Every structure is written in structure tokens, then in C-alpha cells.
């Protein structure tokens, strides 16, 4: 007997879209068959008529249970929302797996932990999430500053343990010098991992910050002048050149400028394994919105830029230059988010893990800009492939985890704070009119959200070991 059968829906599979029924047993998809052809009995049967049946969303970029910089928060001791709250919001938004951070990024650890091994630090971070997540989760490991040689030598062990991606910054206090980057890239590339890179030119950012302060133009609405287009252009291309030299795959987090997208396109045209991520607020807002009342609530670092950049990012998502959509989830309350009002003190991030799927669907699928298959690629499958979860995650296929979202393309819904599920008191998407919305979320065969009602438990989520396929690291596979 099957544990669960889903019938009547329009299913997006790796081989295309069709009218299929799905059989689930022991947390796995065991049958994907033509409509009405599954004759096995099931404990639970779900009628998905009129719905898309999609792989569960994968959020590749979150900052959960992270200490907020005192410069941003205006006071010490502030944390972003807990794993329980963030994963609850994720589940309601059709997301079944998210990737957070362990290691040297500011706020993910208490004090300097660089004398401890990568595995010890991973275990400590995992203990914060285990038993407290409605959905599955994994970690990128952040390498910050002048990374000790002994830490670089531990990268191979971390990859073997299931941590396949390593985050670095080229600016801010976590900046890694390029000599150390060279060694890190070689170690990650030789171990079969992939780099996740926040790329800006640190000299340019610092120069522009000082210039804007000197000229009295350091208001938060000028963030795009400090974290600017040419900085992204130069930094992306330097990282790509280093990755080419070391034969290392690159995943650029939060591409913000058209120049960043052009750099990624140039690399991919050379068949380099370079991938880019788009945040859904970057696909919608421009820096002009910073000037509105409470306008910096939309901000995520580096900076939201010009209308031409927003349009360029949209086109890059449509044409496949950018492979994934993400949130850079960083949920606080409104007083924290708006505490700082200068280019150095505006708080980054927002509570977007629940809104990503319906916003992206509304902007791109309901308008005919991309197909439903492309939507699945950018919200689930590509992240699974690039970051080492495919085909366990990101696919409705025999043998895959039964992570599934039922998405109603005919549901017209206005996003309101009252109907969101994060621990926060604001949403930058308040009033956004959605054409299509996730209604039911299934994690490894268990219904955790049923027609908008939470059914799961914060003990449902598991840590996920990952391994990037060699094909992803050889050429741009997706």
C-alpha cells in the first residue's frame, strides 16, 4: 500500500509537463504514471485537479538565527528569526529545503572560532537547527579573512562529509585576500566542491563610502552609489578569471547589476562552470524605491540598482544566464530593519522566503515570459543541481524525495502581513497582487501545509548531505 497518492494535477517532471499521478512510499516517489493508471491503494489520496504539481521549492540563500550587526540594529544582542519561524514561513511558501551558513560569516558564530576545525563548527551550527525546522536544511561553509592554512586543508574532509559549497566575500569585514582565495579555490576545486561568492570590489566600495560621507551624501537611498555597477563588473570578472585558472565552479550569490549578468554570460559562453543567482526583490524594485517612506526596507546588500539593471536581471533570468532565484533571507522586526539610515548602517535583508515562489510566478509565468518548466528550474531544480542535491531534491521522479508543492495558478491573492508566517511585523511585498499561489506543501511524503493550514512539526526537517555532480563543475549544466 502506498503512503500517499496525488492524482488529477498537471505535473512538472524532468522529462516535461503532463497529466500524471504520483505514488509515494517511505518518503520517496515510487511511481510517476499516466492519469488514473496507479491502481495501488493508498493511505492518503490528494486530488490536485486544477493545480500544478511541482518539486518543492529550494531556497539556496538564507541567514537564519544569525546575530545582527550592532551597527545595523542600533543595539547589541539582536538575532534574525529562528529556524522554526523561518522554516514555518518557508513551508507556507512552497519551500521544502533551504541552505543557510556555518562558519566565519559575522553573526553565525559567537566570537572568533577560527582555531576550531571546520567539522566542529559545522556540528555546532547544525545543533542550532536540528529538531527546530519544519523543512530540510543544509549549510554553505563561510571562509572569512586570512583563512589559516590548516582550515584550507580541512576543506576536502568537509566536502566528503556532505558540505559541498563554500562562501567567501570580496568586501566587508569578512573579505578574503586574493592570495588566500587562490588557495581556497584550488582546495575546493580539487575536492569537488563549488564556491559561493559575494563579489564586489572592496577598494571601490570603501572609496565611494568615504566620498559620499565627505560630500554629505551618505543617506541610505544612495546605497547604489557605494555598491555600484562597475564594482560588480570588475569583481565578477576577477573571480571568474581565478576560477578559470583553478578550474573551480562558481555560484555568484545575489547578482545585482546588468554588468554582473554580462560577466556571467561571457563566462558561460566560454563553457566555464559559472552560475548566477537573482533575488526576487532585485527583480522587482529599483533604487528609486529607496527614497520612498521607509524605502530602505527593500534593501538587501550589495544594493538595488537602476531600472536598467532590474530589466537586465529579468532578461538574464529569462534567457538562462541566471540559473536560480533566491531570497537572501534575513528576517528582523521593522524597528531593526529601519534603525540605520546611512550607507554604512542600513540593515540588509528581508523576510522573503515565503513570497519568492508566488512573486516569481506572477512576474514571469503568469505574464508568459517563462514556461512553468523554467519556473521549476529557477526555483528548485537548478539550485538542486548546482549545489549538490539533485536528483534527491528538485525533481518529481522515481527515487527522488517526495518533496512536492501543489500550486494553484488560478488563485488571485494579495500579499498581506496578516497572512504571512514569519516572525516579523512588516513585509516589503505588502499589497503585491499574486496570480498563482502555493497551497499545499509535502516534505518527504508528509503533508506539512494543507490548503494553507500548518500540519507539520519543527522536528520534521533533516540536515541534508550534498555532493556536486562532476558535470556541474565541468560546464554550465543549467
Label for each model-derived stretch:
Residues 9, 22, 27, 50, ...:
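Divalent metal-coordination and catalytic microenvironments
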Residues 48-128, 132:
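Metal-associated gating/positioning segment near the N- to mid-region
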Residues 338-343, 398-464:
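C-terminal cap of metal-dependent C-N hydrolases
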Residues 118-135, 185-197:
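Alpha-helix-loop-beta-strand connector modules within alpha/beta enzyme cores
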Residues 1-56, 70-74:
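Histidine-rich, glycine-flanked metal-binding segment
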Residues 217-249, 318-319, 323-324, 330-411:
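His/Asp/Glu-enriched, well-ordered alpha-helical/loop segment
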Residues 60-81, 138-151, 170, 225-226:
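Active-site mouth loops of central-metabolism enzymes
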Residues 149-325, 341:
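Histidine/acidic residue-rich metal-binding segments in metalloenzymes
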Amino acid at each position: 500500500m502506498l503512503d500517499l497518492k496525488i492524482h488529477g494535477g498537471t505535473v512538472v517532471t524532468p522529462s516535461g509537463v503532463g497529466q500524471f499521478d504520483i505514488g509515494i512510499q517511505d518518503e520517496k516517489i515510487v511511481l510517476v504514471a499516466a492519469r488514473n493508471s496507479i491502481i495501488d491503494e493508498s493511505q492518503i489520496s490528494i486530488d490536485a485537479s486544477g493545480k500544478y504539481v511541482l518539486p518543492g521549492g529550494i531556497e539556496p540563500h538564507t541567514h537564519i538565527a544569525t546575530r545582527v550587526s550592532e551597527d545595523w540594529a542600533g543595539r547589541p544582542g539582536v538575532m534574525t528569526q529562528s529556524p522554526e519561524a523561518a522554516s514555518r514561513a518557508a513551508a507556507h511558501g512552497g519551500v521544502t529545503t533551504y541552505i543557510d551558513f556555518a562558519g566565519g560569516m559575522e553573526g553565525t558564530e559567537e566570537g572568533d572560532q577560527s582555531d576550531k576545525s571546520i567539522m566542529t563548527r559545522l556540528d555546532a551550527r547544525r545543533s542550532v537547527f536540528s529538531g527546530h525546522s519544519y523543512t530540510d536544511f543544509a549549510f554553505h561553509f563561510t571562509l572569512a579573512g586570512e583563512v589559516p592554512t590548516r582550515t584550507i586543508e580541512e576543506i576536502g574532509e568537509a566536502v566528503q562529509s556532505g558540505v559541498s559549497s563554500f562562501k567567501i566575500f570580496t568586501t566587508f569585514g569578512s573579505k578574503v585576500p586574493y592570495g588566500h582565495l587562490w588557495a581556497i579555490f584550488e582546495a575546493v576545486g580539487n575536492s569537488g566542491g563549488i564556491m559561493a561568492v559575494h563579489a564586489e570590489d572592496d577598494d571601490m566600495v570603501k572609496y565611494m563610502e568615504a566620498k559620499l560621507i565627505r560630500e554629505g551624501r551618505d543617506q541610505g537611498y544612495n546605497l547604489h552609489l557605494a555598491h555600484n555597477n562597475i564594482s560588480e563588473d570588475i569583481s565578477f570578472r576577477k573571480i571568474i578569471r581565478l576560477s578559470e585558472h583553478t578550474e573551480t565552479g562558481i555560484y555568484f550569490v545575489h547578482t545585482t547589476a546588468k554588468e554582473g549578468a554580462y560577466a556571467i554570460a561571457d563566462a558561460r559562453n566560454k563553457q566555464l562552470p559559472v552560475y548566477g543567482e537573482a533575488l526576487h526583490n532585485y527583480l522587482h524594485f529599483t533604487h528609486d524605491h529607496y527614497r520612498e517612506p521607509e524605502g530602505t526596507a527593500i534593501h538587501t546588500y550589495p544594493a538595488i540598482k537602476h531600472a536598467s539593471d532590474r530589466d537586465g536581471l529579468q532578461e538574464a533570468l529569462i534567457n538562462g544566464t541566471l540559473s536560480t532565484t533566491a531570497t537572501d533571507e534575513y528576517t528582523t522586526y521593522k524597528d531593526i530593519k529601519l534603525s540605520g539610515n546611512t550607507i554604512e548602517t542600513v540593515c540588509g535583508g528581508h523576510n522573503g522566503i515565503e513570497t519568492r515562489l508566488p512573486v516569481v510566478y506572477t512576474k514571469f509565468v503568469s505574464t508568459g515570459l517563462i514556461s512553468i518548466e523554467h519556473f521549476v528550474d529557477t526555483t528548485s531544480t537548478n539550485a538542486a543541481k548546482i549545489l549538490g542535491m539533485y536528483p534527491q531534491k528538485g525533481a518529481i521522479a522515481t527515487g527522488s524525495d517526495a518533496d512536492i508543492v501543489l500550486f494553484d495558478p488560478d488563485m488571485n491573492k494579495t500579499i498581506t502581513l496578516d497572512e504571512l508566517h514569519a516572525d516579523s511585523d512588516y513585509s516589503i511585498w505588502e499589497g503585491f497582487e499574486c496570480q498563482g499561489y502555493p497551497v499545499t506543501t509535502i516534505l518527504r511524503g508528509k503533508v506539512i501545509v494543507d490548503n494553507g493550514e500548518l500540519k507539520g512539526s519543527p522536528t520534521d526537517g533533516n540536515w541534508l548531505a550534498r555532493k556536486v555532480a562532476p558535470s556541474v563543475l565541468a560546464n554550465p549544466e543549467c
